């Protein structure tokens, strides 16, 4: 993907990425590179409209809805309806769908034996204390943080996280993290490349090799997906 102005290397703003498809079948194929990818996951933005049946996904996936409405049904007749800011997990399988200008980000997980249920994630699930940043990196007083994990199997996990304001020095990322901000804003920066700010509603991916400091000036909440190489 072409680098956008003022975006750090290996930091991708998925909300401004070109749409990879207007129907779910095309989007699944594009995101998973037709099932031939050796990458741990695929990702992309799609703007879906219309409906379809018999759509196969070879991989488990996470769908995050930025705008519009999306209804998905599995072969057992279970149904999910997503609206703005909602997230669903899907196992590999066959699906029917109906969408109205559904602007979404899809992540497919190229990992065998991963147990993923079909359902909408409860992003308001109670959180427990945890997920604090490394104290040695802080440039402000330590924040108060909390988290909840929906999936914690190595090498991929996802959940929700909240923090009070804090800032830290740049780190070089050795893992991938996709973030969907639900509240607040954050600025990622480094001295050589500048800075980029993301706000509530943005979905972005930080890939291995990115160098970024973190600064959230107000309370922040996010949905996150992390892949840590073995």
Region locations from a protein language model:
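Conserved hydrophobic/aromatic beta-strand scaffold that supports enzyme active sites
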Residues: 43-45, 62, 87-89, 158-160, ...
